[in-house]
């Protein structure tokens, strides 16, 4: 009896498989040898996982008696892994478009924050919003990210600060995890800012004594699934001591450490992350040489966010120094009311232009390395047999177009596939429905 499969993508000009030896991440040298197949095809099974990838003729011969739910002719096109966005803040109400003009006039991030804007403004509006309002806007944002090729996102809470609103946000993230196609890595970020009327010490005590026990109980009950814990380690927010206490308490209940550090001021956050065994530290615009060395030794990923440096006019993260030192460099969009970017292709473009990363380095950082930062490199980030069948098909004969083109990706990206199912297709896209490959 002929075997049945979910999807065949055939005759692609290029397939960027990224890795071929089950690597969990790529360092600088490995990035230069990014695995790209020419004139190839890819098969995804009914379980949503990749069954074969290789030369088109080989695949055609091997699967000559197989049937497929869908077949996509990728002649003249390229196939890439679904992009992984390793850092976003997508659940909130009340945009901050008015603050953009303030930044253009010279106000700094902390100027706005200390005046009651920034995170505090969003906390007020998010607290007032209903669960349904938050979910609808959140769903719309994730759908926009998916149309730009993202198939796995890290989603943070952090615009509640008080336990009730933080749990409301985590429930919204959990609903997305259960109902939407895009994969979600959930992050508790109750230490995103110090609530009004509290000191950092008091806020840390509240998180450790009240928030985390509630999270643990809800996780045990199956109400929510939280993967990571985040803290904004910054001058005027949570100092190094408070950050360490919160992270250690989170680690004690099974959460992965993945936090903001060394963004606006040098805080020794990278060193702390390495010491505590963090999966990742984000931002790192102000990281020290010692911090870079510590990240490399600990295999702690540096999640760099070129949109933030661009919008806030900060100095660029030291991507080249990190790569040379052996750091696992990842990328994220930092989507939030302060950095309104849905597109990982644009993030990769900025990483190349402003952080001096190469095209291959940027793609690896937005796929396998970003998956590593989220603890998902075994399922996402490359197109290897056994991994989840998440792919992006672009209408170009060279994969580099997805980074080279600055914007307009709604025309370039023909379709996005998650677990072998076509979850987005542009208006010009067509598929072949065939019972048998002949």
Swiss-Prot record:
Cofactors: Zn(2+); Fe(3+)
Indicate which residues the UniProt annotation says bind Fe(3+): 260, 334
As to how many cofactors bind and how, the note says: Binds 1 zinc or iron ion per subunit.
Q: What class of enzyme is it?
A: hydrolase
Q: Pfam families, alphabetically?
A: Amidohydro_1
- Which InterPro entries did the record assign? Amidohydro-rel (IPR006680), HutI (IPR005920), Metal-dep_hydrolase_composite (IPR011059), Metal_Hydrolase (IPR032466)
Residues at which Zn(2+) binds: 260, 334
Q: Which residues bind N-formimidoyl-L-glutamate?
A: 159, 336
According to its UniProt record, the EC number is 3.5.2.7
Name of the molecule in the record = Probable imidazolonepropionase
Per the UniProt entry, what species is this protein from, by scientific name? Xenopus laevis
């Amino acid at each position: 009896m002929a075997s049945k499969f979910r999807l065949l993508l055939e005759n692609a000009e290029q397939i960027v498989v990224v890795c071929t030896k089950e690597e969990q991440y790529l360092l600088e040298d490995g990035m230069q040898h990014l695995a790209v197949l020419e004139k190839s095809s890819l098969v995804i099974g009914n379980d949503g996982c990749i069954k074969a990838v290789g030369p088109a003729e080989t695949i055609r011969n091997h699967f000559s008696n197989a049937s497929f739910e869908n077949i996509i002719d990728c002649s003249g096109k390229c196939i890439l892994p679904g992009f992984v966005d390793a850092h976003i803040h997508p659940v909130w109400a009340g945009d901050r478009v008015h603050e953009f003009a303030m930044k253009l006039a010279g106000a700094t991030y902390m100027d706005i924050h200390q005046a009651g804007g920034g995170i505090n403004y969003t906390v007020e509006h998010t607290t007032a919003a209903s669960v349904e309002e938050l979910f609808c806007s959140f769903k719309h944002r994730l759908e926009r990210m998916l149309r730009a090729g993202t198939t796995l996102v890290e989603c943070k809470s952090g615009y509640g600060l008080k336990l009730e609103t933080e749990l409301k946000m985590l429930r919204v993230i959990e609903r997305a995890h259960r109902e939407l196609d895009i994969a979600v890595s959930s992050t508790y970020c109750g230490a995103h800012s110090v609530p009004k009327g509290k000191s950092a010490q008091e806020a840390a005590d509240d998180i450790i004594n009240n928030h985390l026990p509630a999270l643990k109980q809800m996780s045990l009950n199956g109400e929510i699934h939280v993967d990571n814990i985040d803290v904004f380690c910054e001058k005027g927010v949570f100092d190094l001591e408070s950050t360490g206490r919160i992270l250690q308490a989170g680690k004690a209940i099974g959460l992965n450490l993945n936090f903001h550090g060394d963004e606006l001021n040098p805080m020794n956050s990278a060193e702390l992350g390495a010491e505590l065994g963090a999966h990742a530290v984000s931002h790192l615009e102000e990281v020290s040489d010692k911090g870079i060395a510590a990240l490399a030794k600990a295999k702690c990923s540096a999640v760099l966010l070129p949109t933030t440096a661009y919008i806030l006019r900060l100095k660029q993260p030291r991507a080249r120094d990190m790569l040379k030192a052996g750091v696992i460099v990842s990328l994220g969009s930092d989507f939030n009311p302060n950095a309104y970017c849905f597109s990982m292709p644009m993030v990769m473009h900025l990483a190349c232009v402003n952080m001096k990363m190469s095209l291959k380095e940027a793609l690896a950082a937005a796929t396998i390395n970003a998956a590593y930062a989220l603890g998902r490199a075994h399922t996402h980030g490359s197109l290897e047999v056994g991994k989840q069948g998440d792919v992006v098909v672009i209408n170009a004969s060279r994969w580099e177009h997805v980074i080279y083109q600055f914007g307009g990706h709604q025309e370039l990206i023909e379709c996005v596939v998650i677990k072998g199912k076509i979850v987005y297709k542009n208006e010009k896209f067509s598929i072949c429905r065939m019972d048998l490959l002949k």
